[in-house]
Amino acid sequence: MKTWCALGAALLLAAAARSEPRLPPPAQGKPLCERLAARLPNVSRPLCEAARLVDSGARSVNGTPLVLRDIGAARAKLRVLVTGAMHGDELSAASVALHWIRLASGQPMDMPQPVHWRFVPVLNPDGLFSQPPSRTNAHGVDLNRNFPTPNWERDAPVYWQKRTRKDPRRWPGPTPLSEPESRFLHEQMQSFKPHLIVAIHAPYGVLDFDGPSVPPSRLGRLYLDQVGIFPGSLGNYGGVHQGVPVVTIELPNALRTPLDAEMRRMWLDLLRWTAARVPGDPR
């Protein structure tokens, strides 16, 4: 079994760096990377610029471009969507996503398994760039409570009022998908059709999972501890109701990344599990 997992991981590693389509010019050019390098832990301007982030055309509430990066074969049978900084005050989540872009784009190119990675390293730029950084977006909405789970109109407000006691950091918004950032991610799910979604958060130091398949028992030093589902959450919507496995990584610190070696170990563990447990499109 270990041999097969190792082989599968090797296939995914190599596939991440297979020839990819030409990329448009980077979104906002150097100013965006200057802002990210100044705000994020363990992120330099060269690391950000090397990520070759692309303007998706979508905008946040305040008009900031929502950027992404595609790596791998466009016609791959396996598609993985990775998102970071859904909560703007979880700075390390965006940093890890950028480091993983570097790892995904820097592997050998001589293995056949095609994988298409789509990274959205900063889903909530308004929250991230606010002073101080904010969990919510510029409308004060918790994006991870704004996805259209069944009975959202009934359950999400009740959960917010009764369970969180109207915590403003967890306001689900007026309606599902009321926010441009959550609509953007929802559109990515519909158009990209990922077989796996990886959401990077902080600071609880655990690994969560929703949806079909056998969850990973650990990624690096993070062990599986399924914390339950919430109305409007990405895990609830994508994993439970759309049938797309959602791995939620809760880093142990929102303001500091793991060591580079630990980020790489988490990445390799993710690849091994994906190779063993996430089927792509039929060949």
What are these regions (language model features)?
Residues 1-8, 15-43, 53-55, 67, ...:
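C-terminal accessory segments enriched in acidic
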Residues 62-70:
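A short loop-to-beta-strand scaffold at the N-terminal edge of the catalytic core in hydrolase folds
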